[in-house]
C-alpha cells in the first residue's frame, strides 16, 4: 500500500518534525510519500490556481485513488475516513492558499475536515494524524478512543 500527500508549499522545520514522527508510526502499515509542489507567485489569483492545479495533476500517480481536501465537500467521521485507507494506492491533495480548480479533479473523492479555516501547515498535521488514527482504527489499536 502507498499513500501520497501532494501539497502546495513547504512545512517549517517544527511542523516537519511532527509530520515525520507520524510518518514513522504509519510506515508500519503503509508507505507515505510527501510530494511538495512549489507555490506559484503571481498577482493573478486565477493564474496561481491554474498553475498549481496543473503541477499537482502532473504528480498524481496513475491508478491512484485521489482524495481532494476541499471546503466544498462532505465531512466524515474518523471511522469512515479509516475505510478510505483500505485502497491500495491513495493520493491526498492539499491545494495552495487559493485552492485548486476542482473541476480538473474528475473522479476524485472530496473530503472536508471542518467548516473552520486552518493554517496550511497545521492542516498537514491534521491530515497525517487522521491517517495514523485511521490505521489505528483498522488495526484495533488503543490510540483511537
Swiss-Prot record:
Give the location in the cell. Cytoplasm
**Primary enzyme class:** transferase
Entry keyword set: Cytoplasm, Methyltransferase, rRNA processing, S-adenosyl-L-methionine, Transferase
Q: Give yes or no: UniProt keyword Hydrolase.
A: no
Cited Pfam families: SPOUT_MTase
Superkingdom of origin organism: Bacteria
Q: Which reaction does it catalyse?
A: pseudouridine(1915) in 23S rRNA + S-adenosyl-L-methionine = N(3)-methylpseudouridine(1915) in 23S rRNA + S-adenosyl-L-homocysteine + H(+)
PANTHER family referenced in this protein's UniProt entry, alphabetically = METHYLTRANSFERASE, RIBOSOMAL RNA LARGE SUBUNIT METHYLTRANSFERASE H
Which protein are we looking at? Answer: Ribosomal RNA large subunit methyltransferase H
Q: Which organism is it from?
A: Mycoplasmopsis pulmonis (strain UAB CTIP)
The record lists the lineage as: Bacteria, Bacillati, Mycoplasmatota, Mycoplasmoidales, Metamycoplasmataceae
Which gene is annotated as encoding this protein in its UniProt record? rlmH
